[in-house]
Every structure is written in structure tokens, then in C-alpha cells.
Amino acid sequence: MNEQHGLIFDRLNEFFEELNQQDVAPNQEVIELYIKEIYAEVTSLNADNNPYLSRHSVLERLYNLADLTCDFAEIFEEKLFNHLNALNFRNIELKIAKQYKMNGGNDFWRNIWEIYADIALHYSALNIDSKALSNAKTALKLMIRTEAKPDPKWISFLNSRIAYAYQDIAPDKSINYFNKSSDALIEYNKVKDCYENNMGIILNDINIAIIMLEINQVDDAIKQSLKCLDTLNNLFEKYGENEELVNYISHTYSILSRAYFESKDYDNAEKAIEKGLSFCKRLQENKFNNYCEIIDVLYSTKSLILCEKQRYMKAIELQYKLLDVWSDYKEGFKRSTKICDIYVEISMIFSKYLDEQGMSIESARLAFREIKQYTDNELFMSDKYALSVRRRCYINLADAYFRARMYQSAISSYTNALDIMKEEFDMESEKISLVYSYSYTLYQLAMLDFKYNRKAEGCKRLSYSYRSVCTLKKYGGVYEVLFNMVRNALSTYEKKFDGKIIELDTAQ
């Protein structure tokens, strides 16, 4: 039995050395086999029912296994950019920590709440907000309970993780937790004013600007972005130029440009885009991986402005430039989902503005082809971002079919989108953009039901669409536009069918 335990450690060490020499992760099935092997080993290490190993030996093996598991997690985090496998190994580390304590060990090499914090970080990176939220809250609660004097930096970090998890579920709560995160750093700054704390505070402020923009508080988003730029300029003077500051400045200009666009101030939007791009070029020269995401927002905003000015082919050209930008991105899964997003945007421009439904359908199919390599893999089927990309593909394809009067194909694609949304609702039932898509898709299907004289189905879908969109009306903008569309349809079809579909006075 001792020999068997030793062999497992030898094999794991060999596998780790292999990983260390590679630039891409090996076949997922191989990784899964090692994960199962580690789980089996951890489960077998129980001093109470193990006649071959002393309690000391069990604890020692668990300790060494935890150390090795942590190494695996770090290599997937930092070198292979694979959050899914990093999460798998952090979950094993948590199991080992609990097993260690269960076997009477009190000197585990790090706090359990730190492992929960890492797990929250990876769920957040995988866009699984509900699990990111629960793990971050657990980490914060355990830290406050077990630490005599909790570290303000950890309090700040965990509050920011909770804020990120709330961002697309409860925006007001998200802003509140970002402010709590900053409060902890401001208190710490009174003791020791330092670069890391100031960067943490400005990052929270930038995220608050993003949320304001997402919930259509456009004027507030502009004010918040300008405030962030003032602070960043002061930090620039204080600390000098570095990649992180240049990244935050270009990122803030990308938010400001989109906020100006939403306020229909296209001149200031274009000025912000140019300033953002000038900073972003420095990131691109240094191969800073985040520059792709910032250029994405800047180019996308410029594309929207071009569409407003009816320069549609120029807008499409810019989207194709974005394809080149993302082709250099390191992380394959994110690269493919972003490329898929761009094809969806190209499809929308062809469909909505140019009435080129054939080109729109072809672009949507290219989007499916790009994401197919991942969404056919069961490991990625539950990833929220992948699901949302596939959902948008189907909705956009359905819209193109609808405009081309290919109604049966439109119904099929809208229905496929609804099927994906059922999976998404199981994961994130309150996500704002998901509720919007759900209400819109039901509305479109209701219109098609009425076209084919399916009154009962159409009325049912329209009532569900209305109930959903009522929860979004308070955010204004596109949400209020959809609310009015659905409400007007209800009024029209109630008159046509001479009866109430839903009580109209329930609007929030």
C-alpha cells in the first residue's frame, strides 16, 4: 500500500514536469484521468480506517498532495491560461484541506478561506456568477471568523469578488460591494499609502463606471469615467508610466467613448476613442494580453458610430480588423468566443442595416463554426459565456431569417435560443441581459404565432414576455424600448381577440 502511494506521487510529479515544458494544455481526457486519480488518493487517505498508514503518515501525504495540487492549479492559471482546469485543481485542494482537518491536522499550509477565494476567482473568470458569489461570500465569512485581525487587502479583494459576481445580477449591490472594497483600501492607505492600494481603488471606480453604463445611467457613467481619468492622471504623475496605468487609462477611455455614444455625443465619443487607441498602441507594442479587450470596445463603439452615420461597409471593415486583433489572443476559448461575437455583429449589420439577409446568415454560420470546437465539448457546455454566445448566434440568425421572410427557419432558430436560455436560467436566473433576450425571443415567437394564426400560443408567449420585461423597464434605454414594444403588442392583440391577455396594471 505504501509503495502504491509512492508510485502515485511519482506519476503526478512526472506529469507536472511534462506540463511545465508545454505551452498548451494536453488532451483534456488525460487531465481528467489524473484528476480522478488524485480524488481517489485523497479519499483513501483516512487515518481512522487505514491500517497501513499512521495518522502522521496520512497527514504528511495529504500535505504533500496539497502542495502538488496547488502547483498544478498555478501552472494552469499562470502559464496555460486554463481557468477550468485551475478550478478543478483548486477544488481538489479544498477537499484535501478538509480531509487534513478531519484527520486531526491543525497546521495546514494555508487557510481554507484562501482556497475558497481562489475558487471564486476562477468561477468569476468562467462567468459562473452564482458560484463565484457563494464562494467569495464563504471566504469572507470564514476569514472574519478565523482571523483575529483580518487583512484589509483581503477584505478588499473578497468584497471586489462579490461585487463582480453581482455585476450582471444585481447592479446596485455590485456598486455597494465595490465601494466596500475601496473603503478597506482607503483605511489601509491611512496607515501606509502605496501603489497597490491606489490601483485597487481606481479599478473599483472603473468597474462602477461600467455598471452605470450597463444600467443606462449614462450621465453618471460619463461623470464617473472623467473622475477616474483625473485620478489616473494624478497617479501617472506620481508613479510614472507603466503597463498597468496605461491599461487602466485606455480602458477608461473605452468606457467613456461608449457612454458618449449612448448620449448621442458622437464627436466626444470619437475623441475618446482616439485617445484610448493612442494609449492602447503602447500595450499592443508590449504584447500586453489585455489590449485585445480594450481595442474591442473602442472599435465596436466606432463601428456603432459609423452605423449611425450610415457608413455600414466601413463599420463591417472595422469588425474585420477586430478579427485580426483577436487572432493573436493567447487563450483559445476566449479567442473563439470573441471571434464568434464579431461574426454575430457583422451578421447583424448585414441584416438590420443593409437588408443583405444572405450575407447575414452566412456570417452567423461562420460564428457557429468558430464556437463549435468548444461548445461540442461537454466540459464547455456549462460555461455561461459560451452559452450566451451561442444564444446570441441563434437570435441573430433567427432575426436574419425573419427579415428574409424565412419564417419556419426563424422559428427553429428562436426555439434553439430558448433551449439554450433554459440552461442559462438554471445557472443565472436573474441575469439582466439574459432576461432581455428571453423577453425579446418570446415576443418574436409570439409575432410568428399570430402570423400562423396560433392565437393561444402567441398570447401565452406574449404574456410571459411582458412579465419578464417588466423587471427591466427601470433600466431605461433598450430595455424600455422592448417594454413598450411588448406592451403595445398586448394592447393590439387584446383588441383583436376581444379579451384580456394579462392585467396591464402590473408594470413595475
Predicted regions and their residues:
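Hydrophobic/aromatic packing residues within the alpha-helices of TPR/SEL1-like helical repeat arrays
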Residues: 35-38, 83, 90, 97, ...
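Structural motif corresponding to the intra-repeat A-B loop/turn of tetratricopeptide repeats
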Residues: 79-80, 126, 168-169, 215, ...
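TPR/TPR-like alpha-solenoid signature
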Residues: 9-13, 63, 67-70, 110, ...
